[in-house]
Amino acid sequence: MGSSLWTCLILLSLASASFAANPRTPIDVPFGRNYVPTWAFDHIKYLNGGSEIQLHLDKYTGTGFQSKGSYLFGHFSMYIKLVPGDSAGTVTAFYLSSTNAEHDEIDFEFLGNRTGQPYILQTNVFTGGKGDREQRIYLWFDPTTQYHRYSVLWNMYQIVFYVDDYPIRVFKNSNDLGVKFPFNQPMKIYNSLWNADDWATRGGLEKTDWSKAPFIASYKGFHIDGCEASVNAKFCDTQGKRWWDQPEFRDLDAAQWQKLAWVRNKYTIYNYCTDRKRYSQVPPECTRDRDI
């Protein structure tokens, strides 16, 4: 059986499994409802009344935008169509971050590549200023031809990274194991497109080909479903009352763990949990997150 047919059959079987804890599908609102540009305003193009935007990168600058509010817990998503063609050296990002020195951060970073070579999706989690929890996967589709939804479910129990409806990573609250978990620093949502050819593609060996500029990444789906808080707030005033706080979102169910296992087994190219040169002892959260 051909590998593409086998992949299709696996996807269909996973999609047909019943599960009870999928995040809600976000509604569509225009860019200006929840977001503002952060730099290089002239490198952002607005389409369809602001329901879609394009970020442009050239040899002079990239650009980006951020949420107006800060949030403690919720479900945060973005529909993104990545830079097509030769995107080597570029990074398209969607992430949450707090603003102080010992910051918390939840990252999606899409690392560009030469034409015909696949994108790499790198995820990372920073807690109390400590990161170094990179995981890298290939995607099972071409992310440049149409929009796909990338999202984060963040509550007191876990952080789940999703690609469309597929969980690709879980970071459990392992505070009892001595691992900090983001629970008291509100985060803003950031999106950006920039040049990172000193590291992004093959460790910096592949440089950005500026003859291909401008590089364009497209975004839509600007709804935010989170507990809005001031930057200095230490708790969500509706904690325990929102849909993402309910018992069915405190863990993945069997079907979701099956989907995650499929992604890990088929598409993982790096996982800090299994990097014995970097960590002689398995980081304590990895067992709970089923990463080993």
UniProtKB/Swiss-Prot annotation:
EC numbers: 2.4.1.207
Catalytic positions are E105, E109
What PROSITE patterns has UniProt attached to this entry?
A: GH16_1, GH16_2
Q: Which GO terms describe its molecular function?
A: hydrolase activity, hydrolyzing O-glycosyl compounds; polysaccharide binding; xyloglucan:xyloglucosyl transferase activity
Q: Where in the cell is it found?
A: Secreted, Cell wall; Secreted, Extracellular space, Apoplast
Using the UniProt record, name the top-level EC class of this enzyme in a single word. Answer: transferase
Q: In which tissues is it expressed?
A: Predominantly expressed in the phloem fibers of growing internodes. Expressed in xylem cells in the basal part of the internode. In the internode, it is expressed closer to the top of the internode compared to XTHB.
Name a single GO biological process.
xyloglucan metabolic process
Domain named GH16: residues = 21-219
Keywords of this protein's UniProt record, alphabetized?
Apoplast, Cell wall, Cell wall biogenesis/degradation, Disulfide bond, Glycoprotein, Glycosidase, Hydrolase, Secreted, Signal, Transferase
Q: Where does xyloglucan bind?
A: E109, Q122, T123, N124, D132, R133, E134, D198, W199, G203, R278
Instruction: One Pfam family, please name it.
Output: XET_C
Keyword Transferase included in the entry's annotation = yes
Q: Which InterPro entries match?
A: Beta-glucanase/XTH (IPR044791), ConA-like_dom_sf (IPR013320), GH16 (IPR000757), GH16_AS (IPR008263), XET_C (IPR010713), XTH (IPR016455)
Question: What's a single GO CC term here?
Answer: apoplast
**Glycosylation site positions:** N113
Q: Which Gene3D superfamilies match?
A: 2.60.120.200
Task: Spell out the reaction equation it catalyses.
Answer: breaks a beta-(1->4) bond in the backbone of a xyloglucan and transfers the xyloglucanyl segment on to O-4 of the non-reducing terminal glucose residue of an acceptor, which can be a xyloglucan or an oligosaccharide of xyloglucan
Induction / repression? Up-regulated by indole-3-acetic acid (IAA) and fusicoccin. Effect of IAA is however nullified in 0.25 M mannitol, which prevents cell expansion without affecting auxin action per se.
Say what the protein does: Catalyzes xyloglucan endohydrolysis (XEH) and/or endotransglycosylation (XET). Cleaves and religates xyloglucan polymers, an essential constituent of the primary cell wall, and thereby participates in cell wall construction of growing tissues.
PANTHER family assigned to the protein according to its UniProt record, in alphabetical order: XYLOGLUCAN ENDOTRANSGLUCOSYLASE/HYDROLASE PROTEIN 8-RELATED (PTHR31062)
Protein name from the UniProt record: Xyloglucan endotransglucosylase/hydrolase protein A
